[in-house]
Structures are given as C-alpha cells and as structure tokens.
Curated annotation (Swiss-Prot):
This is Mitochondrial import inner membrane translocase subunit Tim10. Pfam families: zf-Tim10_DDP. One of its GO terms (molecular function) is metal ion binding. A motif (Twin CX3C motif) lies at residues 37-62. The gene is TIM10. Disulfide bonds join C37-C62, C41-C58. The keyword Secreted does not apply.
Amino acid sequence: MFGLGGAPQISSEQKLQAAEAELDMVTGMFNQLVDQCHSKCINKSYGDSDITKQEALCLDRCVAKYFDTNVQVGEHMQKLGQSGQFMGRK
C-alpha cells in the first residue's frame, strides 16, 4: 500500500523499452550467430543448390557451441554479479 516496501511499479513505456532492448539484443545475437556459422560452415562457391551433409553437421555443431558458450558466459557473469566482482568491483 502507498508503495512502501513493495516492488516499484514499472510504467507501460518502461516495459515497452525493455522489450525493445531485449528484442534488439536477441536479434543482434541471432545475426552474429548466422554470420559466424555461415562463414565457417558454408562453402563460398555454392556448388550445390542444397546444404550438404557436411555443411549441415558443421552448422549444427556451430549453433550448439554458440548457445553453450552463451549459457556458460551468462552463468559466469551472474556469479560475478552476485559476488560483487562484476564491473570492476571486488
């Protein structure tokens, strides 16, 4: 009641800004994933009209590694944030 001791209220505009920022982050991550895995796995000459088995396997592994790495980095950053070491704090 009266905003004492409760969680602060977030306006609709703040929610929209947060959603847009999250969408931008996810879109950026997706574009980075596509760029990296495409340049690593897809032959530049495009000799076949379809993705080869070798390219598909490479793409599968590349995407899996990318997401595994993101999870590991996220967990590490969360631990640093909880311990106060994130952003140069010790």
